[in-house]
């Protein structure tokens, strides 16, 4: 076999081996996606209950429904204060092979920093995932907290420390507001990069929650009640307990959402790699067939020429 044919054949075999790997990785990512979607659906039931009760309590507790930014009785997680420093909790992956997942989240963060005039002097980073931590540390940013090694389906117990730390640093006035930057899962082929304010809890955020609750229906088609609760011993005591839980549910929910998007992005990246491998194999196979045909034609011509010369 000519050297050129042997080289093409080796490339075909190598590409086929790579395709087997990417195809297997796609299947694994898809399985992880299905698993975390089931977990998220279960968690969402709890989160929605917390949101519904909180909206009801705030509306009954605040003198002017959901206009509470200066109502200190609702707690420091609601009260606005002058912004001297901004905290950003950015969620990325620990590894690559996730397509544009990490780069898009980082771009969204940088765009928000530019929009708000944020820099290394007035920004404090908390990072979930090695990629984001390394990116911002290399650029001289203040990374106050790092969390790596998030499992494929993170439990609240696993990420409890980062959730508590994000809230505690705000309460300790290390920063005066907290953004969270992550990739929101839309569907298996689409995601949306978000950089949203988490703390202080905003009126707009609760109004949106209130609207979602109002549009939600129970399994029998009856609207889910969001405002009829009897609270003991007092609204204030319940708010003291519920407001931190609400903030924690927002942060943990974003981590679950980001991990779901990561698995979807990984599955799509591996699917794209497998498709590209198929295209390369087809092209190489065509080259191989043409080269083989040319080699056969050359051999026939040489044999025919030799026989003619003998005559």
Curated annotation (Swiss-Prot):
Produces ATP from ADP in the presence of a proton gradient across the membrane. The gamma chain is believed to be important in regulating ATPase activity and the flow of protons through the CF(0) complex. PANTHER family: ATP SYNTHASE GAMMA CHAIN, ATP SYNTHASE SUBUNIT GAMMA, MITOCHONDRIAL. F-type ATPases have 2 components, CF(1) - the catalytic core - and CF(0) - the membrane proton channel. CF(1) has five subunits: alpha(3), beta(3), gamma(1), delta(1), epsilon(1). CF(0) has three main subunits: a, b and c. Keywords: ATP synthesis, Cell membrane, CF(1), Hydrogen ion transport, Ion transport, Membrane, Transport. GO terms for biological process: proton motive force-driven plasma membrane ATP synthesis. The keyword Disulfide bond does not apply. It is a peripheral membrane protein. GO terms for cellular component: plasma membrane; proton-transporting ATP synthase complex. This is ATP synthase gamma chain. One of its GO terms (molecular function) is ATP binding. The keyword Transport applies.
């Amino acid at each position: 076999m000519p050297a050129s044919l042997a080289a093409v054949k080796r490339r075909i075999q190598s590409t086929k081996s790579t395709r087997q790997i990417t195809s297997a990785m796609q299947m694994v990512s898809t399985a992880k996606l299905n698993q975390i979607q089931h977990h998220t659906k279960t968690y969402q039931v709890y989160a929605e209950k917390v949101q519904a009760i909180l909206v009801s309590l705030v509306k009954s507790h605040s003198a002017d429904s959901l206009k509470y930014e200066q109502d200190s009785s609702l707690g420091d997680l609601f009260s606005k204060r002058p912004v001297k420093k901004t905290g950003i909790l950015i969620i990325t992956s620990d590894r690559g092979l996730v397509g544009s997942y990490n780069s898009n989240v980082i771009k969204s963060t940088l765009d928000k920093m530019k929009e708000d005039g944020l820099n290394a002097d007035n920004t404090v980073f908390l990072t979930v995932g090695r990629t984001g931590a390394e990116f911002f540390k290399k650029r001289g940013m203040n990374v106050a907290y790092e969390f790596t090694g998030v499992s494929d389906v993170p439990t609240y117990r696993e990420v409890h420390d980062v959730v508590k730390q994000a809230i505690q640093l705000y309460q300790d006035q290390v920063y005066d507001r907290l953004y969270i930057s992550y990739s929101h899962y839309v569907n298996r082929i689409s995601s949306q990069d978000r950089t949203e304010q988490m703390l202080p809890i905003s009126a707009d955020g609760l109004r949106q929650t209130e609207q979602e609750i109002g549009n939600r229906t129970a399994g029998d088609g009856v609207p889910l009640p969001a405002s009829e609760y009897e609270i003991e011993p007092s609204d204030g005591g319940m708010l003291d307990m519920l407001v931190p839980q609400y903030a924690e549910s927002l942060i943990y929910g974003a981590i679950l959402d980001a991990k779901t998007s990561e698995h979807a992005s990984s599955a799509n990246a591996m699917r794209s790699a497998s498709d590209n491998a198929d295209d390369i194999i087809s092209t190489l196979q065509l080259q191989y067939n043409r080269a083989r045909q040319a080699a056969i034609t050359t051999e026939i011509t040489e044999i025919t020429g030799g026989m003619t010369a003998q005559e």
